[in-house]
């Protein structure tokens, strides 16, 4: 009670919620003390600082004299008690809901490049993510492709096909006159002289038949021998 003319104990005021009056300092107190940031007190008439409660993990109290704690927002967390703020989720992690005491690693196939996020992002087609907690996606290498989002690996180009640049979503069939016997290749082989490849997407070249020839490489057919030749 700060008034000088008070005559009874009823003129003394209870400490407000969010505050206390320290009984160890003796009677005749004229002020109350606010609970510090990171603590709160919902009750009136408190007589000790221990009546101010630490904020729970997953919660915070940002300023002094508070009557309640506040949940950490989605995208943030707080592992410790008695804190005045929450922590942004790291890149590669997320916090999906409020009041959380920990962050969660982005799963394989997903990533998050920013801090303080509540979700992770699927890898784009043409990209992959092969480890948890990733902050970026990885482009598919030459000879590989990925048509789908959210994948952990890329697909090797099939025999008869190739992928000649990174981050591709499709493979390309070898053109007529070329072939590819192996998987995961970035180019096709040109048919040798004396051979041909008659259609697209082939895995081998074909020898010119008797009575035909081919002097050039990379051809899709052979030429009949002229009259008088074989």
Positions of PLM-derived features:
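Disulfide-rich, cysteine-dense extracellular ectodomains and adjacent flexible linkers of secreted
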Residues: 1-230
